């Protein structure tokens, strides 16, 4: 006979290891607030030291190092190839947007420290317990999305590390200054700082999607039971039981919506920064590919340029799946509303059961996907818009490139 552990999926056996890895990696960057699934409470003294370290590390990124790189700005962009210099300017702008996102992330984490812990982390843990006995089919897509995100992020980290080593190897040849290597490391740290929070937000939204799907399955099961009601002496008793269960489901649905709303409210400015960074990354990617194709042979293309192009593509995919999760949440809410419209009314409808159905239907009308800063919906349309906008700016860069080529 197989043991219970052998019947578990790989994710179920190692789930908490993934969460612990994410928490430890966030602690390296001073983000104590990021704890996917709290497993062991930190001692007060250790927590105070980690918070102090987080403030010092953030001040180093926000105040000290930018001054150093601004002082060496000319060194960062100095090159005899004017077309390559244009690429440096675009990359510098990309890092500047990451820097602004880091500032927003630091302020948000500081201001919403307790709120993120209570309204996101603990609320998600509470909902996980509430849906412990719910249908487990929605866990499989959730596991896939988490696997994919984990592999993609680690692949992007390895690509950036390879790019840094490539630049470091060229320093000895005198083709790239030491300052540019430092700047590449700085950009890598900025990306990790913002990505930690983006991954946490992705985790919360992925959990919201899973809970909505489990909620919809429970709602469908309850609907099937209502369809099976027959007139008789126990009808009112069954209606009372169904009313209690529907009231419980309505409370859970409200908690799921509150979790998504609070997560968006506290992370919306960081997500806006992520969208802007994606825009510049796509612009850099388009122009990098053009820069490669404009060369007479691929042998003349530097290795960091190729690595940067691959990284920008991965960054776009990363942003796309973040938006895709929100797209699926919107579709799942529509599916829940459809399930509610299909509720059958027994011949002798209990007044309380009717009231619960009406209350849940009315609440679902107000459960619209939250907007970023009240301006934009984070869905696939926004990602497509970013790609089109980046391509439009890319055409402008190509015009500058052609002008510089003629001038040289």
UniProtKB/Swiss-Prot annotation:
Gene: Gr10a
Highest taxon, organism lineage: Eukaryota
Residue spans crossing the bilayer: 21-38, 49-69, 87-107, 145-165, 271-291, 305-325, 382-402
Residues on Cytoplasmic side: 1-20, 70-86, 166-270, 326-381
GO molecular function: ligand-gated monoatomic ion channel activity; taste receptor activity
GO cellular component: axon; dendrite; membrane; neuronal cell body; plasma membrane
GO biological process: monoatomic ion transmembrane transport; sensory perception of taste; signal transduction
UniProt membrane topology term: Multi-pass membrane protein
Tissue specificity comment: Expressed in the medial aspect of the third antennal segment, and in neurons of the terminal external chemosensory organ of larvae.
Protein family membership: Belongs to the insect chemoreceptor superfamily. Gustatory receptor (GR) family. Gr10a subfamily.
The protein's name in its UniProt record: Gustatory receptor 10a
Topology, Extracellular side: 39-48, 108-144, 292-304, 403-408
A Pfam match: 7tm_7
Alphabetical list of InterPro entries matching this protein: 7TM_chemorcpt
Localization terms from the record: Cell membrane
UniProt keyword annotations, A-Z: Cell membrane, Membrane, Receptor, Transducer, Transmembrane, Transmembrane helix
Role summary: Probable gustatory receptor which mediates acceptance or avoidance behavior, depending on its substrates.
């Amino acid at each position: 006979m197989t043991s219970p552990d052998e019947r578990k999926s790989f994710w179920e056996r190692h789930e908490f290891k993934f969460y612990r890895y994410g928490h430890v990696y966030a602690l390296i960057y001073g983000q104590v607030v990021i704890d996917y699934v709290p497993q062991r409470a930190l001692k007060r003294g250790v927590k105070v030291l980690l918070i102090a370290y987080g403030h010092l590390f953030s001040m180093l990124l926000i105040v000290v190092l930018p001054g150093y790189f601004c002082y060496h700005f000319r060194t960062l962009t100095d090159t005899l190839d004017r077309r390559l210099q244009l690429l440096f300017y675009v990359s510098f702008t990309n890092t500047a947007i990451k820097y602004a996102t880091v500032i927003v992330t630091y302020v948000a984490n500081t201001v919403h420290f307790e709120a993120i812990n209570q309204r996101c982390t603990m609320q998600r843990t509470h909902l996980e317990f509430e849906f412990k006995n719910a249908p487990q089919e929605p866990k499989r897509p959730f596991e896939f999305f988490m696997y994919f995100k984990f592999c993609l992020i680690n692949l992007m980290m390895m690509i950036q590390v390879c790019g840094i080593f490539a630049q470091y190897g060229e320093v000895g040849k005198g083709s790239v200054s030491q300052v540019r290597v430092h700047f590449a490391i700085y950009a890598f740290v900025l990306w990790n700082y913002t990505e930690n929070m983006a991954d946490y937000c992705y985790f919360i939204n992925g959990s919201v999607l899973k809970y909505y799907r489990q909620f919809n399955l429970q709602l469908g099961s309850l609907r099937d039971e209502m369809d099976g009601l027959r007139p008789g002496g126990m009808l009112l008793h069954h209606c009372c039981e169904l009313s209690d269960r529907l009231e419980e489901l309505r409370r859970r649905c409200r908690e799921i919506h509150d979790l998504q709303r609070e997560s968006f409210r506290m992370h919306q400015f960081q997500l806006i920064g992520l969208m802007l960074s994606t825009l510049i990354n796509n612009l850099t990617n388009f122009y990098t590919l053009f820069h490669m194709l404009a060369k007479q042979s691929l042998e003349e293309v530097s290795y960091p340029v190729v690595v940067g192009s691959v990284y920008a593509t991965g960054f776009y995919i990363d942003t796309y799946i973040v938006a895709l999760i929100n797209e699926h949440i919107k579709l799942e809410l529509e599916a829940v509303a459809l399930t509610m419209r299909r509720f059958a009314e027994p011949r002798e409808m209990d007044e309380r059961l009717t009231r619960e159905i009406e209350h849940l239907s009315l609440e679902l009308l107000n459960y619209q996907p939250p907007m970023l800063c009240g301006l934009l919906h984070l869905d696939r349309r926004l990602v497509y818009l970013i790609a089109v906008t980046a391509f439009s700016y890319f055409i402008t860069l190509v015009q500058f490139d052609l002008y510089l080529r003629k001038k040289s």
